């Protein structure tokens, strides 16, 4: 059996301000740093010892991973970073407050942008300084391969090859891996290993800073699944994500 741990980054500064973040590289809030530390403690208490870890190119995920590993005294394990684990790109919505967008466009339209499976938000122009084509961390990637906006479907198509080609083989080789990433890139992995439908995945909310632990067999069949949190804490965290566009 193999242990796969998925960890959505702790609360970011823009989570706190309820803004669309996407590929904008904001850091963790103080609460987010505490969530990352608590995630490390929860894994320690559960006897989970990752042998390798994966994260995105964005500091809120990287710092969540670093804090969690440091808490576990596992700062020395191999860490692999990939842009394919980045959050969904929210295009021209990045930096805008979700509730303000509801006032302008209506809750239905904003929820379509947030939650519809295959409808991307308005794109970010390629000459915008925040476009990934203009960011040196992506200079090794062809501009045409970098997103200006993404639907959840687009995010899945970006993330899954990396999971299949790198994360899963490392899991089978080392026995236990930790993936610290983002709500939508993690939803891509969850959809794949749980074989969820489009309707099921758009309704799934992954809370910040709470490890989701799968035990799987050689074929990624799930033998057990659990969040490392008590029921009340988990419920509040999931509701917090679900209510981001509600007045």
UniProtKB/Swiss-Prot annotation:
The gene is gpmA. Signal peptide: none annotated. One of its GO terms (biological process) is glycolytic process. InterPro entries: His_Pase_superF_clade-1, His_PPase_superfam, PG/BPGM_mutase_AS, Phosphogly_mut1. It holds the Pfam family His_Phos_1. GO terms for molecular function: phosphoglycerate mutase activity. Keywords: Gluconeogenesis, Glycolysis, Isomerase. Belongs to the phosphoglycerate mutase family. BPG-dependent PGAM subfamily. This is 2,3-bisphosphoglycerate-dependent phosphoglycerate mutase. The active site is at residues 9, 87. SUPFAM superfamilies: Phosphoglycerate mutase-like (SSF53254). Substrate binds at residues 8-15, 21-22, 60, 87-90, 98, 114-115, 183-184. Pathway: Carbohydrate degradation; glycolysis; pyruvate from D-glyceraldehyde 3-phosphate: step 3/5. It is an enzyme of class 5 (isomerase). The record marks 182 as: Transition state stabilizer. It catalyses: (2R)-2-phosphoglycerate = (2R)-3-phosphoglycerate. CDD domains: HP_PGM_like. Catalyzes the interconversion of 2-phosphoglycerate and 3-phosphoglycerate. SMART domains: PGAM (SM00855). Its EC number is 5.4.2.11.
């Amino acid at each position: 059996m193999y242990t796969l741990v998925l960890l959505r980054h702790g609360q970011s500064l823009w989570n706190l301000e309820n803004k669309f973040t996407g590929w904008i590289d904001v850091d963790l809030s103080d609460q987010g740093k505490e969530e990352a530390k608590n995630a490390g403690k929860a894994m320690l208490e559960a006897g989970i010892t990752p042998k390798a870890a994966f994260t995105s190119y964005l500091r809120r995920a990287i710092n969540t991973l670093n804090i969690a590993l440091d808490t576990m005294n596992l700062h020395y394990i191999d860490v692999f970073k990939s842009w394919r684990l980045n959050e969904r790109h929210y295009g021209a919505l990045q930096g805008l407050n979700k509730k303000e967008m509801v006032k302008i466009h209506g809750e239905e339209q904003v929820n379509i942008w947030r939650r519809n499976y295959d409808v991307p938000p308005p794109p970010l122009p390629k000459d915008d300084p925040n476009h990934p084509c203009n960011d040196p961390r992506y200079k090794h990637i062809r501009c045409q391969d970098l997103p200006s906006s993404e639907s959840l479907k687009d995010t899945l198509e970006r993330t899954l090859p990396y999971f299949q080609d790198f994360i899963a083989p490392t899991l089978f080789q080392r026995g236990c891996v930790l993936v610290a990433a983002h709500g939508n890139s993690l939803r891509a992995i969850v959809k794949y290993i749980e074989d969820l439908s489009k309707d099921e995945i758009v309704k799934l909310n992954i809370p910040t800073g709470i490890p989701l632990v799968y035990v799987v067999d050689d074929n990624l069949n799930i033998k057990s699944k659990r969040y490392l949190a008590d029921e009340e804490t988990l419920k509040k965290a999931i509701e917090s994500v679900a209510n981001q566009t509600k007045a």
